[in-house]
From Swiss-Prot:
Protein name stated in the entry: Deoxyribose-phosphate aldolase
Gene Ontology MF annotations: deoxyribose-phosphate aldolase activity
Subcellular location: Cytoplasm
Catalyzed reactions: 2-deoxy-D-ribose 5-phosphate = D-glyceraldehyde 3-phosphate + acetaldehyde
Gene responsible for this protein: deoC
Record Pfam families: DeoC
Broad class of where this protein is predominantly found: cytoplasm
GO cellular component: a single term: cytoplasm
PANTHER family listed in its UniProt record: DEOXYRIBOSE-PHOSPHATE ALDOLASE
Source superkingdom: Bacteria
NCBIfam families cross-referenced by the UniProt entry: deoC
Keywords in alphabetical order: Cytoplasm, Lyase, Schiff base
Family per record: Belongs to the DeoC/FbaB aldolase family. DeoC type 1 subfamily.
SUPFAM superfamilies membership: Aldolase
């Protein structure tokens, strides 16, 4: 039987997320033994304090949700988040650079954050809904060469979330050693199971409680 809890990065990334909601997120993660809590970097100190002494990891997004900032700012934010207690980093690639053919710049962007995250797992968000298969494969191969821990489908803030065919393509490209995180629109146990069967080893969702309980998630959840 699948232990769904250990796949879940319990996530709250909304701009209007309150401290009380973040605290509740942490409490749910501890109660259900989720793998991690994933938040914006400004909430990392609070989450690190709430999760101290537990097995739940602290995950921060970087360059979120557009990925279009300066590379130096992403590296700075990642270091600041780690210093504040982040144990995993999820960064967004610069999709515009990729679609402009600036492949070396995309690689340098990832590498700069990877160097900051030398001691902790880095997950690279591709925003697959904006890419074609060739671009997905290109970034996955790039991440494998840079020894990135995970490739991740989506921010959940663009035109679409995780799709089985993209998860399967990512898994087939990176092989069995790297992680694949499916995120965005994974709101129930059936969808989570399909993503896992397609090759996902982590699920980013705000519907973790619904997934582990087998219940329906609230409308509009990440």
């Amino acid at each position: 039987m699948t232990d769904y809890a250990r796949y879940i990065d319990h996530t709250l990334l909304a701009a209007n997320a309150t401290e009380q909601q973040i605290i509740a997120l942490c409490d749910e993660a501890v109660a259900h033994r989720f793998y991690a809590v994933c938040v914006n970097s400004g909430y990392v100190p609070l989450v690190a304090e709430k999760l101290k002494g537990t097995d739940v990891q602290v995950c921060s997004v970087i360059g979120f949700p557009l990925g279009a900032g300066l590379t130096a700012s992403k590296a700075f934010e990642a270091k600041a988040a780690i210093d504040a207690g982040a144990q995993e980093i999820d960064m967004v690639i610069n999709v515009g650079w990729l679609k402009s053919g600036k492949i070396a710049a995309v690689q340098a962007d990832i590498q700069a954050v990877r160097e900051v995250c030398a001691a902790i797992p880095l997950k690279v968000i591709l925003e697959t809904c904006l890419l074609d298969d060739e671009q997905i494969v290109l970034v996955c191969e790039m991440c494998r060469q840079l020894d990135v821990a995970f490739v991740k489908t989506s921010t959940g803030f663009s035109t679409g979330g995780a799709r089985e065919e993209h998860v399967r393509l990512m898994r087939n490209t990176v092989g069995s050693e790297m992680g694949v995180k499916a995120s965005g629109a994974v709101r129930d146990r059936q969808t989570a199971q399909r993503m896992i069967e397609a090759g996902a080893t982590r699920i980013g969702t705000s519907s973790g409680v619904a997934i582990v309980s087998g219940e329906a998630a609230a409308a509009g959840n990440y």
